Amino acid sequence: MKKKGFIIGGICLAVVAGILGYNHEAVRVVFHNVYSPSVKLDDSSKWNGGKAYEKLPYSEASENDYLDLYVPDSEKPMPLIILVHGGGFVYNDSQSRQAQLMYRYFRDHGYACASVNYRLAQEAAFPAGVEDVKSAIRFLRANAEKYGYDPERFAIWGESAGGYLSVICGASNDEEFNSVPFIGEDENHPVSSEVQMILDYYGCVEFGTMEDDYKELRIPRIVRWAASLWLQGAIKDTGYEDVESYWMRKDVKTLTEDEKN
C-alpha cells in the first residue's frame, strides 16, 4: 500500500508539473527519486560472496544512523568507497536504486563499500546530515581492522544531495561538524574523519544562485522547497550559500586531467 501511494503521488506530481509547463526532464528525475527506494535490483552475478553487513548502526543519534557495508574477499585490506545517497535531502535511503548501482559496481571491482544512511531534513535540518556522515566515516575508520579494509585509503562518493554532503565532509577538517559521536568513540578517541578522495556526482556546492537557476530551468517548486527545508529557510537568508565556507583542509586539490586518466 505504501509503495502504491508513492507511485500515485509521483504520477500526480508529474501530471501537475506537465500542466504547469515545468521542465519534463526535472519531473522525470523527481519521479525517479520518489520511486527508487521501492526498487530492488537483482543480485549481482559478479559478487564473490565476501561479507555484507546491512543496517549496521554507527551512531545513537537517530535510528536512521546506520550503514550497509560490503567487503569482498581479499588477502589484504582494500580501499573503502563511502557512498552517500541523494534525494533532495528529503528522500531515499542507503538502499536507493542509485546507491545499489554504485555499491555493486565498486564492490564487484574489488573495493569495500559502505552506503551511509543519514537523517533527512524532515527529521533534522542542516547540519545534522553532515554530522551523521562524518560520524559514519569515523566509525568506519575505527573499525577498519575488524571488518577488513584499509583505514588510510578512504574515498567518499555522493550523488545530488549526497554529492553536497560528500564535498562538505571531505573538505572540512576534523573540528568541523563533529558533534555526533559514533558508537564506540569513547574507546577510540580521537579518530579522524578525513578522506583521501572526494567524488561529487552532480551535487550542488553553491546555493547562492540556486533560486535563479531553478526558475530559469523551470524546476518544480517542490524541489526548490526541499533545499530550503534542509537549510531551515530561504536559501539566500541562511548564510550557508556555498561549500567554500567549510573548505578548511589546506591539502584539498582538484585532480588534473592526467590524474583523472
PLM region spans:
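N-terminal Sec-pathway targeting helices
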Residues: M1-V16
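Alpha/beta-hydrolase superfamily serine-hydrolase fold, recognizing
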Residues: V15-N261
